[in-house]
Design a protein with these regions (language model features):
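Membrane-interfacial helical/loop segments at transmembrane boundaries in membrane proteins
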Residues: 1-2, 61-79, 132-154, 265-273
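An N-terminal, globular interaction/scaffold subdomain
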Residues: 2-102
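Alpha-helical transmembrane segments of polytopic membrane proteins
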Residues: 8-20, 45, 73-93, 112-126, ...
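C-terminal transmembrane-bundle signature of multipass membrane proteins
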Residues: 21-25, 220-333
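C-terminal ends of transmembrane helices
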Residues: 23-34, 92-106, 174-184, 230-238, ...
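Short, structured coil/loop segments at alpha-helix boundaries
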Residues: 31-36, 104-108, 154, 161, ...
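Hydrophobic alpha-helical transmembrane segments and adjacent interfacial helices
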Residues: 44-65, 93-101, 116-134, 195-211, ...
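Generic multipass alpha-helical transmembrane bundles of integral membrane proteins
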Residues: 105-238
Length: 335
């Protein structure tokens, strides 16, 4: 069993999960469909969060009791959470610039590699966190350890397997410059990022949250990963990476300001901290990403293409449906 969800509080656990899942899908749609929605969600909200967090940091530095006991300081004070939320927001604004074709940068050929760069950075943030946990096992001899936020993590080969899976996952991204705006300007599209990558990424990232965010994984691993994937598979073909960035930023901001929801509310759902489950999930992540990179290499060889400079999933249903949505813009000659 991965989570403590079965028992007298089962309905409450699932209700909390459903609230997060549905909320992320709805807010993602607001952010992608309107400029005003994007401005509020990815402009006003981050500014308010930053002011709030800076105020807490100042209070902590002065030894203020209200700041020292604030849930954001108690539960969200590690480097990881701040790195993740601002990296996600950087991705969002880059994607928005591309989909609205803002100025020279929005149409520039070189900037179309931005999605690859920011996703790789986000993945490496998680990989470093996994290896940080592995350090506690291999160097400090700790099979479990408690973070600065009071979360107990399992440490061991599960971190190594998943860290390697994350590194492989970076190279499973193909067609780095094949990124476009949709004709209706609701989405930034990455057609060559098909189900092959999405599934490999989701398994890896779920394992990361299970390893390193055991008190949050029910929400940030299960609900947060499923929301953008459902959208991409059903109604937003080619837009998965934008869905992922938007929902990740939304969740990270919410969790940073309202950690009470996942830490102390009636909806709290913890992982079982079962070493066997953690190892099994990490092996699944590694196998999935090895399988993905092998399949990508096979298609690249079959089509005679460089998988990073060219599309390797040309001819597949996913790519063709996504490509049909792209705007008629001559990116090759954009300054």
């Amino acid at each position: 069993m991965l989570f403590d969800v079965w028992g007298s509080d089962t309905l409450i656990h699932w209700a909390g999960w459903a609230m997060v899942f549905i909320g992320l899908i709805v807010l993602n749609e607001v952010g992608r469909r309107t400029k005003l929605g994007a401005a509020i969600i990815f402009g006003v909200a981050p500014l308010a969060m930053t002011i709030y967090c800076v105020a807490i940091a100042i209070g902590v530095s002065q030894g203020a009791e209200w700041a020292l006991t604030n849930p954001t300081h108690v539960y969200q004070n590690s480097w990881f959470h701040y790195a993740k939320v601002y990296a996600a927001l950087a991705g969002c604004w880059g994607f928005i610039a591309i989909k609205y074709q803002w100025g020279k940068i929005g149409k520039a050929h070189w900037f179309r590699a931005w999605p690859f760069v920011i996703v790789a950075i986000n993945i490496m943030i998680a990989v470093v966190s996994d290896f940080e946990s592995a350090y506690h096992f291999f160097v400090l001899g700790q099979s479990t350890w408690v973070t600065s936020e009071g979360a107990t993590q399992l440490a061991g080969w599960n971190n190594v397997f998943n860290g390697i899976a994350g590194i492989i996952n970076i190279f499973c991204m193909t067609g780095w410059w094949s990124v476009y705006a949709s004709e209706d300007k609701t989405d930034m599209l990455w057609p060559d990022m098909t189900w092959v990558y999405i599934i490999a990424y989701d398994i890896w990232n779920f394992c990361y949250t299970y390893n390193c965010l055991p008190t949050h994984s029910w929400f940030c691993g299960f609900a947060l990963l499923l929301a953008p994937t459902v959208a991409a598979f059903i109604w937003n073909k080619g837009g998965w990476i934008q869905n992922r960035a938007f929902t990740l930023a939304i969740w990270c901001m919410f969790a940073q300001v309202f950690p009470y929801f996942q830490e102390e509310s009636i909806f709290v759902t913890h992982s079982t901290l079962d070493p066997g489950a953690a190892t099994a999930v990490s092996i699944a992540a590694l196998v999935a990403n090895i399988a993905a990179i092998i399949y990508i290499a096979y298609r690249a060889k079959k089509l005679g293409r460089n998988p990073y400079k060219q599309d390797v999933f040309e001819g597949t249903s996913d790519l063709e449906k996504a490509t049909a949505r792209r705007a008629k813009v001559d990116y090759a000659h954009a300054e």
